[in-house]
């Protein structure tokens, strides 16, 4: 490793090779459980170009040095910049932060991995371009990294990987490939048409360790002729069944235009308040306190945030259909921003997010009960009321049994619900971290037993989640391993990412 680090310094300069105390920022910000030896980087390197990435990869191959790639390292609740395999060198792409092109006519951007949502938003605003981003909740993350990890947002362009078009990838041998139309010299549709000619390979570079994405095209939304965000609140937890049954036909028929979310009481309240304001005790809040929070914050046990996009002639019709569909639920309330007088307010916050304005407001929930740690449990289900209430009962029951408040949302996709439960815990309390670990593993087992799979997870659980996708004697993982061995025979790229290990590290792996 010493010789490899010296070679890295010759490539990048000593200022961009980090060792010793300088590696501290590449640790998991929320270590789970209490084990200081896990997920520890030996060093980190920060290239500034594709050519420098190529050179680093070639040296890593020569010395068999494992590289853990991060775009900006802001994937908090999923491990941050920490590697699965301790002793890895973090390949930090945050210096590769060029916005190479933003095309207003065709609605796309071509960016490097270090470009954040704040960066791209600022670029568009400074130039007065009539384009909107789609952003996840924390805007400090990488546009490329979030798409590769199957992140989601809240406009009609909410499927971030679905909106990527054309990649540049450095393979494990240092070779550079461009996918789709980018494989043709002098082609001018690289960011316009995904597929090119032959197999579509972009997908194998998402949530994987088969290559290092150094450029990506991302589609941007043209600024609509009108925008109307709204909030619909529901007074009972059991309402989630009827709410989701109403949502499905509205979504399938594009009456609901965006990736709307159905958010729980505590998740929304926690953005702007703390638990101690209502219940200065340990354990989950009782029903009486939940009702107090509802009245104080003017929200429901479930809160549906959505938006309408387009000229009034269109949005008026869509709103009438939406309002009439939900009006059948007893106690339902409808709001537009002008109806919300208190500040700060959940609809005012979400109104920005649903028009692509990056923020960090969502991190407010970390102050709910102190300690600042959180992890996301994210099983996927069909858009049915039966599945929604089944998942809610299963997850919220276990969360409360373990002494935590249920903080969840159901994000409405094109055909599916992402049920994202945020478990907030005291990262400084070893017992609470252990309790969190036990809860998470129980949730994974019980969800898998019901056929619900997670779509992303913390590095601590990648092997565990990968193991739940075991149909036909784990034939999918066997295919992943075959691809891994072919593209990365020395196993240097992000060992253990998504449970995919190189041949020499596979034996004896357990979740």
Regions found by a protein language model. Name each.
Residues 52-55, 119, 237-244, 312-320, ...:
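Short, conserved charged micro-motifs
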Residues 201, 217-218, 228-239, 243-354:
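C-terminal cap/substrate-recognition region of VAO/PCMH-type FAD-linked oxidoreductases
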């Amino acid at each position: 490793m010493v010789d490899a680090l010296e070679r890295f310094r010759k490539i990048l300069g000593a200022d961009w090779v980090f060792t010793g105390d300088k590696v501290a920022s590449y640790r998991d910000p929320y270590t789970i459980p209490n084990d200081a030896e896990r997920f520890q980087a030996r060093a980190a390197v920060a290239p500034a170009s594709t050519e420098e990435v190529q050179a680093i990869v070639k040296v890593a191959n020569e010395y068999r040095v494992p590289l853990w790639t991060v775009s900006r390292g802001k994937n908090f609740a999923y491990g941050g910049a920490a590697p699965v395999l301790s002793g890895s060198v973090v390949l930090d792409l945050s210096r590769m932060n060029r916005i190479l092109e933003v095309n207003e006519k065709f609605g796309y951007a071509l960016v490097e991995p270090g470009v954040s949502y704040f960066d791209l938003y600022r670029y568009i605003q400074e130039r007065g371009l009539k384009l909107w981003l789609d952003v996840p909740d924390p805007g400090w993350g990488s546009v490329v990294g979030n798409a590769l990890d199957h992140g989601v947002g809240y406009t009609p362009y909410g499927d971030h990987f679905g909106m990527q078009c054309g990649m540049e990838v450095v393979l494990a041998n240092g070779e550079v490939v461009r996918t789709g139309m980018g494989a043709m010299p002098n082609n001018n549709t690289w960011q316009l048409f995904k597929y090119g000619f032959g197999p579509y390979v972009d997908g194998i570079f998402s949530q994987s360790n088969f290559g290092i994405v150094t450029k990506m095209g991302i589609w941007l939304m043209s600024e609509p002729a009108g925008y109307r965000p709204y909030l619909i609140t529901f007074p009972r937890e059991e309402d989630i069944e009827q709410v989701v049954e109403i949502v499905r036909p509205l979504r399938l028929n594009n009456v609901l235009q965006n990736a709307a979310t159905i958010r729980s009481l505590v998740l929304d309240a926690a953005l702007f308040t703390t638990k101690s304001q209502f219940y200065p005790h340990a354990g989950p809040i009782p029903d009486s306190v939940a009702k107090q929070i509802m009245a104080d914050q003017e929200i429901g046990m479930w809160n549906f945030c959505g938006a309408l996009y387009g000229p009034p002639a269109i949005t008026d019709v869509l709103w009438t259909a939406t309002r009439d569909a939900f009006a059948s639920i007893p106690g339902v309330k409808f709001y537009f921003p002008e109806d919300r007088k208190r500040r700060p307010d959940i609809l005012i916050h979400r109104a920005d997010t649903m028009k692509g304005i990056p923020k960090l407001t969502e991190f407010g929930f970390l102050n709910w009960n102190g300690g600042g740690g959180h992890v996301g449990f994210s099983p996927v289900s069909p858009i049915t009321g039966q599945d929604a209430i089944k998942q809610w009962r299963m997850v919220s029951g276990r969360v409360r049994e373990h002494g935590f408040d249920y903080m969840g949302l159901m994000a409405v996709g094109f055909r599916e619900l992402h049920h994202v439960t945020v478990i907030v815990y005291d990262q400084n309390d070893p017992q609470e971290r252990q309790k969190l670990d036990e809860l998470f593993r129980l949730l994974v087992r019980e969800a898998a037993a019901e056929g619900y799979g997670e779509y992303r997870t913390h590095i601590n659980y990648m092997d565990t989640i990968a193991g739940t996708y075991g149909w036909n004697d784990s034939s999918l993982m066997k295919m992943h391993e075959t691809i891994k061995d072919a593209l990365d025979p020395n196993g240097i790229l992000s060992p253990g990412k998504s449970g995919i290990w190189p041949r020499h590290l596979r034996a004896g792996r357990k979740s």
